[in-house]
């Protein structure tokens, strides 16, 4: 069932909110690269290897910390909002593609659409100062097989998640459940309901003490809502579609 849905795509969880998506044709897409200082990322996976695209939902360190070094190392194109794109260009990264909410761009063999997210966004520069990072967003990534994955980024639940479901029909949602600075498991269950998805990977929990939400709480709230969900609790380093 899951293999059929993925259509040859592989999804590797690298910890926190970082995922590598590998297309059937071998293209590699990294979402929210937080690797070197990520306590959840297995040491052997902190070097990403070949990479084509980097998607950045917002500028906070736990989503953006390794975007520039990885882009330098691999030559991957960084896709992010205008402010983050401008910043990475100022740091010498030539391959940068601005994308904003509601816009869709073809990047290699996939289509990437920017979606709304309710959070904050700032960039901590190398000298320790903080600059404006534009507005946060999520992404819907559509593969040539028709498989669609929604990475919500950091966000609260919001009513227009229903619209994301209606317009794009994601098959799989990667949803934060950590609470306090992102959705709680309770809100994440309602996000799954609004999106109308059947498959969810919980993310952005347990990395730091202020992210106490758990997959068990998420599963309980989903069950109380009567949702028929397949919840894929992935350990860092695990892969869907292998």
Curated annotation (Swiss-Prot):
<dbReference type="InterPro" id="IPR001279">
    <property type="entry name" value="Metallo-B-lactamas"/>
</dbReference>
<dbReference type="InterPro" id="IPR036866">
    <property type="entry name" value="RibonucZ/Hydroxyglut_hydro"/>
</dbReference>
<dbReference type="InterPro" id="IPR050114">
    <property type="entry name" value="UPF0173_UPF0282_UlaG_hydrolase"/>
</dbReference>
<dbReference type="GO" id="GO:0016787">
    <property type="term" value="F:hydrolase activity"/>
</dbReference>
<protein>
    <recommendedName>
        <fullName>UPF0173 metal-dependent hydrolase Rxyl_1261</fullName>
    </recommendedName>
</protein>
<keyword id="KW-0378">Hydrolase</keyword>
<comment type="similarity">
    <text>Belongs to the UPF0173 family.</text>
</comment>
<dbReference type="InterPro" id="IPR022877">
    <property type="entry name" value="UPF0173"/>
</dbReference>
<dbReference type="Pfam" id="PF12706">
    <property type="entry name" value="Lactamase_B_2"/>
</dbReference>
């Amino acid at each position: 069932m899951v293999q059929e849905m993925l259509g040859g795509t592989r999804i590797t969880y690298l910890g926190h909110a970082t995922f590598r998506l590998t297309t059937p044709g071998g293209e590699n897409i990294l979402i929210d690269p937080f690797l070197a200082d990520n306590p959840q990322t297995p040491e052997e996976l902190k070097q990403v290897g070949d990479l084509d695209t980097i998607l950045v939902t917002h500028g906070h360190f736990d989503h953006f910390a390794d975007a520039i070094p990885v882009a330098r190392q691999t030559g991957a194109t960084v896709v992010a909002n205008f402010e983050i794109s401008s910043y990475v260009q100022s740091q010498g990264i030539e391959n940068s593609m601005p994308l904003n909410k509601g816009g869709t761009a073809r990047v290699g063999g996939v289509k990437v659409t920017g979606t709304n997210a309710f959070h904050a966004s700032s960039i901590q520069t190398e000298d320790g100062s903080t600059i404006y990072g534009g507005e946060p967003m999520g992404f819907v990534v559509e593969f040539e097989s028709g498989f669609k994955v929604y990475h919500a980024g950091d966000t609260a639940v919001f009513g227009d998640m229903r619209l994301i479901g209606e317009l794009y029909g994601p098959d799989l949602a990667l949803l934060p459940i950590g609470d306090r600075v992102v959705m709680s498991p309770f809100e994440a269950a309602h996000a799954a309901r609004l999106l109308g998805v059947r498959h969810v990977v919980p993310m952005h929990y347990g990395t730091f003490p202020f992210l106490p939400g758990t997959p068990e709480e998420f599963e309980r709230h989903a069950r109380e809502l009567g949702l028929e969900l397949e919840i894929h609790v992935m350990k860092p380093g695990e892969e869907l579609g292998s």
